[in-house]
Amino acid sequence: MIEPFLLGIILGLIPITLIGLFVTAYLQYRRGDQLDF
């Protein structure tokens, strides 16, 4: 059984991780678009 506190941390980190990955990919895409890769 998962503790509510641990579950809360996991549910809190997942959206942050997804947003971080999305922003990183977007910045790399923009950077690559500017450099014409």
UniProtKB/Swiss-Prot annotation:
Disulfide bonds: none annotated. It comes from the Eukaryota. It is a single-pass membrane protein. One of its GO terms (cellular component) is thylakoid membrane. One of its GO terms (molecular function) is electron transporter, transferring electrons within cytochrome b6/f complex of photosystem II activity. Keywords: Electron transport, Membrane, Photosynthesis, Plastid, Transmembrane, Transmembrane helix, Transport. InterPro entries: Cyt_6/f_cplx_su5, Cyt_6/f_cplx_su5_sf. Coiled coil: none annotated. Its main location: plastid. The chain crosses the membrane at residues 5-25. One of its GO terms (biological process) is photosynthesis. SUPFAM superfamilies: PetG subunit of the cytochrome b6f complex. It is found in: Plastid membrane. The keyword Transit peptide does not apply. Component of the cytochrome b6-f complex, which mediates electron transfer between photosystem II (PSII) and photosystem I (PSI), cyclic electron flow around PSI, and state transitions. PetG is required for either the stability or assembly of the cytochrome b6-f complex. The 4 large subunits of the cytochrome b6-f complex are cytochrome b6, subunit IV (17 kDa polypeptide, PetD), cytochrome f and the Rieske protein, while the 4 small subunits are PetG, PetL, PetM and PetN. The complex functions as a dimer. Belongs to the PetG family. This is Cytochrome b6-f complex subunit 5. It comes from Cuscuta obtusiflora (Peruvian dodder). The gene is petG.
